[in-house]
Every structure is written in C-alpha cells, then in structure tokens.
Amino acid sequence: MRGAGGAAFGDGVSAVRFCAVSAGEGRDDDDDGMARRLTLLVTSWDGTARRYACRAREIGDVKSLNSIDLGAPALCGTFVGTDEDAACVGCLDGSVRFVDFKTGAFRVVGAHDDGAVSAVEYDDATKKLFTFGWDRTIRAWDLTKDERGRAVSTTKTAGKCYAADLRDGKIFVATSDGQVLAYETRDLVRGVDGDDGRRASEAPPRPLINRRSSMRFQTRAIAANIRGDGFVAASVEGRVAVEFIRDEENDKRKYAFKCHRKTDDASVGEIVYPVHAVAFHPVHGTFATGGGDGYVNFWDGDAKKRLFQSPRYPTSISALAFSPCGSLLAIASSYAHEERENNKPEDRVFLRETRAEEVTPKSAKTS
C-alpha cells in the first residue's frame, strides 16, 4: 500500500475516481494494462480537486500533477470521458464546476437550487453531465454550450439525492425517502428544448426502477454492476443489498447481508459501522466495500461470499475506485466522524495493487 503522493489533505477526502481509458490507449506490449499510465482524481472537503499519475507496476511512484482550489468544499468529481485534463466537481454550496487541469482554471457550469451536489456522472452515450442534488433534482448539463446556470433538463425526485452511479447509459439513485430510482440517460434528455433549457414535454421520464429500498436505514452508497442488470447499495447500518432491475428477477434473487461490524467485549456487544463506499471490479464483476471500521472487504455477489478482507487502514474508508483494468484500487482513508474524535489520523489516499485471489469470483477459481 502506498499513499498517493504522500500529500496531506486539509480536510476529509470525499471522492476518488480514475480516468477512463480509450480502447487501445496507452497499452503495453503484453496488453495487460499494468504499465499503462493512470490518472486519478481526488476531491476533498478542503475545497481542492487534485490529480495524480501512477502505474500498477510502479505503484510506489505516484506523482502529484496539480491541485486546484475551488473555494468551496468538493463532495464529488468525475473526469469528462477519457479526457484526463477535464473534470467536473460538485460542491457543498450546490455549484457544479468544470475544472481544466491543463490551465489550472475552473468555471461554474451551473448550480442546484438548494443544498449540496451529492454526485456527478458523465455519460458518453449522450455526451451530458448528470448531477444529483439535495434539492431533489437530477440535472443534465451540456458542457459544449457556454450557458452558465442553465441545465438542459431537470428531473424531480421525491427525496434528496444522497448517492448515485452511472454505467452503460443507466443511472441509479438512492434518495432520502428510502427510494431507489433508475433511469436510462437518454430518457432524461429526450425531448429537451435546447433554447430555454426546460423539458419540452411535461410528462416526466419513466424510471426503470422506482421502488422502496430493501434496507431500513439510509443508503450511503450505490454502484451499478458490470452486467447492467442490477446494483449494490450500502447503508449506514453496516448492511449491503444486492438487487436487480427487473422486478421478477429482483423478487427471486435479491438479498442483503451484514458487514463492517465488530464485537466489543468491553461494551454492550456489536458495534455497527456505516458502509461509505462500494466499487465494482471492471473485469470480474466482484465488488469492494469500505466502512467506518477502516477495512475494505472484497465480495463475490453471485456466490454470496467474502473473498478477502484488507488489513485495517488508519481510519474510516470514505471512498473507493478501481482503475479501468482493475489492477489498482484507490482507497480514501478519511475520518467520517462515526465516533468521538480522538487523535484523528491524517486523511490520505492509498493505492492497492489487486491480487487475483481478492477479485476473482469463486466460480472462476474452481472452474
């Protein structure tokens, strides 16, 4: 394990994200992606968006490329497609900012009306940026248009958007009222009026999913699986749910399990930690969870088995991200105030080189 550049953060780390890689881009001779140069985006409550460069075969050689002060706590971020110089960040003040790492400048794309931006996702299919806010809206932005403050579409949700993920043209959203929603991205921007930025049709887009979460407590993180037929959601109650889009399949196959808990003999019994992060391995389809207990667990969702538990990190795991080939896992170790603050460790980002036994499904190991 290595810290990303050894850099200290002035406040908690909110998100980590690798830049996507175009087909054939940066591949080495044996085509395993291990020598490929990777770019990592890190956002922080200290108001910075930072960029790092690394390689799996040279995991100790992590280079800090640049850091941009946004002037507001940054809660989430994503690269714009495969452009490692362009990123978008959502902030606590509701603003959505486009960051140009090449020039070191940023501009405000727009803003949500009330409250923070909890997630930002760029969709290659529609070439739109989707943002999710505490103002109970999902907004789509056209980054090619210099129309500040004007979203090309706005979709209302019943609850605040607390967590979201996008994969292969599907958006998954967990809201404050305990609902889970899913949409096709093309449906969210279909029929928009490009002149005034409002939806041309009054009929709201029809969701793929609009159902009650199977977990009793607040959803903290959500991630779409790599097959595109379901998702994993994690809650503040140390529990993870595996669910599917189609109602018939979901009724048969959905399940939930407890994790990130420990028994404390000196107290009343079990201590339950929130699960702050979920990330799917891009090749094998297994997934990792990060909790307030400081551990990263690797899971085979189909076999319903834990594959591996990492050594304990200095403090809570606030964010996770696999590299495009799955050779690296970025791990944000950042205190999330689950317990009384006492000698709080330094907020850091670690890079872990994944091993086959940690991420390979059990069915593949035995075949």
Annotated model-derived regions:
Residues 1-367:
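WD40-repeat beta-propeller superdomains and closely related acidic/aromatic-rich repeat-like regions
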